[in-house]
From Swiss-Prot:
Residues 1-236 form the CoA carboxyltransferase C-terminal domain. GO terms for cellular component: acetyl-CoA carboxylase complex. This is Acetyl-coenzyme A carboxylase carboxyl transferase subunit alpha. It is found in: Cytoplasm. Gene3D superfamilies: 2-enoyl-CoA Hydratase, Chain A, domain 1. It catalyses: N(6)-carboxybiotinyl-L-lysyl-[protein] + acetyl-CoA = N(6)-biotinyl-L-lysyl-[protein] + malonyl-CoA. Belongs to the AccA family. Its main location: cytoplasm. PROSITE patterns: COA_CT_CTER (PS50989).
């Protein structure tokens, strides 16, 4: 098994910690909030309020299920537009009250169904990109599994983007890439090697800012590492003047 195929397998492992796991293990007193105030509540995106080292924060993330029944309720971690609108509602609320935002990302991509398109999937994603680029509070995004396409990017326009060691981040799935390029989805591993989807490759290109180690660590130790890094980096980001924070975020994405 090549390194990239191993990363693909581990990134998609159903046993990985989910957004709700991290929300309850890293933060104190997490309280989930529901609904986009327009259409419905999307189970594929969860979010709410919590405390980190005594400071109020907003936590938002894409939630996959841990079994078939849970996955059906969570739409296999593929958000509908109402999920992205719920996330934006919580981010604007965080901006109003001066709370830092932490997002967790694990999705193959936004849901491509007819209903999602009819309800404005593209608009919902685009609006998140626009609003996050100018959100007046610190944002840290963490990829905890798959980071697929615009569905992942809609929660990843952040001051810092981190990846766990065995996760992936790409414009689309390797299977989709292979199907488009070669009309053969079975060449997914070959496609993944061309796409440069691993944490190490993306760190070298400056697309991600930090890699959270996983190899040789228990889940509880990984949680502790993320928590310590979040406390350190949020404190650092909050110390920056607002104009500098927003300009650095803008320049971070313009350099691509």
């Amino acid at each position: 098994m090549t390194d990239v195929s191993r990363v693909l397998k581990e990134a998609r492992d159903q046993g990985r910690l989910t957004t709700l796991d991290y929300a309850n293990l890293i933060f104190d007193d997490f309280m989930e909030l529901h609904g986009d105030r327009h259409f419905s509540d999307d189970g594929a995106i969860v979010g709410g309020l919590a405390y980190l080292a005594g400071q109020p924060v907003t936590v938002i993330g894409i939630q996959k299920g841990k079994n078939l029944q849970d996955n059906l309720a969570r739409n296999f971690g593929q958000p509908n537009p109402e999920g992205y609108r719920k996330a934006l509602r919580l981010m604007k609320q965080a901006e109003k009250f001066g709370r830092p935002v932490v997002t967790f990302i694990n999705t193959a991509g936004a849901y491509p169904g007819v209903g999602a398109e009819e309800r404005g999937q593209g608009e919902a994603i685009a609006k998140n990109l626009m609003e996050m680029s100018d959100l007046k509070v610190p944002i840290i995004a963490i990829i905890i599994g798959e980071g697929g396409s615009g569905g992942a990017l809609a929660l990843a326009v952040a001051d810092q983007v981190w990846m766990l060691e065995n996760t992936m981040y790409a414009v689309l799935s390797p299977e989709g890439f292979a199907s488009i390029l070669w009309k053969d989805g079975s060449r997914a591993t070959e496609a993944a090697e061309l796409m440069k989807i691993t944490a190490g490759e993306l760190y070298q290109m400056g697309i991600v800012d930090r890699i959270i180690p996983e190899h040789g660590y228990f889940s509880s130790e990984i949680v502790d590492i993320i928590k310590a890094n979040l406390i350190e980096q949020i404190t650092s980001l909050q110390a920056k003047p607002l104009d500098q924070l927003l300009d650095e975020r803008y320049q971070r994405f313009r350099k691509y």
